[in-house]
């Protein structure tokens, strides 16, 4: 993919491809947290198990409760047949296995694209499906997650459901947790969803240091842009929970009324606004009780499996795996691969957690910590980090202007003879997205139709572009594509 677009070409995104050493968060060298290996590893295992329980046990409630909440009153966590792959955990699984085999925690963009083309082709939806179609025409991360090119990217909930495992990689290091998580969630999102990534990754990292939900939430708030919408959402939910501590239904109604922002149901329940609110509410009303937290996540509804998985990860870290095992829940130690060809078919919950633990050890060491033995016991010495906003919100108009300036030469180069079909298709797509199609049509009337013909050789991309995208971004791109002369694929 020598001609594919990579972030190395663009200053706007270049930070995402740098090595971790360039981003070592500043920590006080005298301020360390020491945890026994037994405790740290138990919390990582608890976080993963909480994520799996939240994800899979809430699937019956996923996108089921919209205007009104659910009515679950009793629930016993269980995985009697073991866990299985689902997009709330298996995209992270693909990354973790690859990171184990890599010298860096921050996989390069073309490596990530290769992983998707090998393993992540089915059982993906919304922004992630759009990502996979953009990869077909040679667009690599993080541009696959640019709102200018991916109409789901400025609201999609994958900024949350692809971040939890990375929070487990950086215990007590919320800045590092957010940074690693952003590297991978930027494959599919930007903007407000990137604030959700930082919010929840930082909260998971902080859960290794305290069981106080309010302190964990404070760390999350310190990790997001002070002017982002999610800050107001979290502030509102906290206020409503304090006002109605015994009436979660009223809080749910207030969330629905204020943050159901669009007419389209899919846009709303797939958006970071309602999902962030529901997750925070579940944590506040659950107050550290694993079962109560997940019941609340189920009942708040919307994209419930996403919300329960995130809340379950946080409370799972607090409780630890040994505590969960003492509850006598039916849990079979299995992680069945039902969705990701080429990935291990013999994975268990234990081996999945082992992978996270191994990488977490590397992350701790890369940030100035160490694993040592004292009095016959193995201890992790972890540099404590203060939570901080790693990536503020950027002005979308400025981003679009920068992309247009930097991508235009590549678009023009595709007008030459002997250019590959993929390069021509990519040029047509980029021109449509960046508002350059009209000028190309006028200035190159003989070549522009050839670019469109090349793009029409990718019917799966046209399908998500012209038929499957919701919200203002989807409407904008559809209108631009049709105005440029793009034809809908034959049904």
Q: Where are the regions that the model predicts?
A:
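Mature N-terminal segment immediately following signal peptide/propeptide cleavage
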Residues: 37-58
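Bacterial N-terminal signal peptides
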Residues: 8-21
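Catalytic phosphate/nucleotide-handling subdomain of diverse soluble enzymes
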Residues: 53, 57, 64, 68-73, ...
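Active-site-surrounding "flap" and adjacent substrate/cofactor-binding loops of secreted or lumenal enzymes
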Residues: 59-95, 99, 106-128
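Helix-termini ("caps") and immediately adjacent flexible loops/tails
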Residues: 28-37, 86, 244-273, 319-491
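Boundary at the C-terminal end of the N-terminal hydrophobic targeting segment
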Residues: 22-26
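Extracytoplasmic mature domains of secreted/periplasmic and thylakoid-lumen proteins
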Residues: 103-158, 166-169
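Accessory "access/gating" subregions that flank catalytic or transport cores
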Residues: 35, 40, 145-154, 165-173, ...
């Amino acid at each position: 993919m020598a001609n594919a677009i990579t972030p190395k070409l663009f200053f706007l995104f270049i930070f995402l491809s740098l090595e971790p050493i360039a981003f070592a968060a500043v920590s006080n060298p005298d301020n360390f947290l020491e945890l026994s290996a037994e405790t740290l590893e138990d919390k990582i295992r608890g976080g993963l198990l909480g994520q799996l329980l939240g994800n899979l046990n809430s699937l019956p409630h996923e996108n089921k409760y919209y205007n009104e909440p659910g009515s679950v009153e009793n629930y016993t966590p269980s995985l009697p047949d073991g866990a299985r792959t689902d997009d709330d955990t298996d995209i992270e699984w693909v990354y973790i296995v690859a990171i184990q085999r890599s010298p860096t925690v921050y996989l390069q963009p073309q490596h990530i694209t290769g992983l998707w083309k090998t393993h992540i082709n089915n059982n993906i939806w919304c922004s992630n499906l759009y990502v996979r179609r953009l990869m077909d025409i040679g667009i690599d991360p993080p541009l696959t997650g640019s709102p200018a090119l991916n109409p789901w990217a400025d609201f999609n909930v994958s900024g949350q459901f692809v971040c939890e495992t990375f929070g487990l990689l950086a215990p007590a290091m919320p800045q590092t947790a957010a940074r690693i998580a952003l590297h991978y969630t930027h494959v599919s999102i930007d903007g407000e969803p990137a604030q959700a990534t930082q919010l929840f990754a930082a909260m998971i990292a902080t859960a290794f240091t305290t069981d106080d939900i309010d302190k964990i939430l404070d760390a999350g708030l310190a990790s997001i842009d002070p002017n982002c919408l999610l800050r107001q959402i979290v502030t509102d939910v906290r206020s409503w929970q304090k006002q109605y501590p015994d009436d979660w239904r009223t809080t749910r109604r207030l969330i629905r009324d204020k943050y159901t922002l669009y007419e389209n149901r899919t846009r709303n329940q797939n958006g970071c606004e309602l999902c962030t609110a529901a997750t925070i509410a579940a944590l506040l009303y659950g107050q550290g009780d694993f079962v109560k937290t997940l019941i609340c996540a189920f009942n708040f509804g919307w994209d419930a499996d996403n919300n329960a998985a995130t809340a379950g990860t946080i409370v799972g870290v607090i409780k630890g795996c040994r505590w969960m095992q003492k509850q006598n829940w039916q849990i079979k130690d299995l992680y069945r691969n039902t969705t990701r060809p080429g990935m291990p078919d013999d994975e268990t919950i234990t081996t999945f957690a082992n992978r996270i633990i191994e990488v977490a050890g590397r992350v701790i060491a890369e940030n100035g910590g160490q694993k040592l033995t004292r009095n016959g016991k193995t201890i992790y010495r972890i540099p404590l980090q203060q939570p901080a906003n790693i990536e503020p919100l950027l002005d979308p108009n400025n981003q679009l202007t920068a992309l247009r300036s930097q991508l235009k030469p590549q678009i023009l180069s595709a007008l030459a003879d002997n250019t590959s079909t993929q390069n021509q298709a990519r040029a047509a797509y980029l021109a449509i997205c960046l508002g350059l199609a009209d000028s190309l049509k006028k200035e190159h009337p003989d070549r522009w139709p050839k670019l469109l013909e090349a793009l029409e050789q990718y019917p799966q991309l046209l399908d998500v572009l012209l038929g499957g995208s919701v919200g203002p971004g989807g409407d904008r791109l559809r209108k631009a594509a049709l105005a440029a002369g793009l034809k809908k694929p034959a049904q």
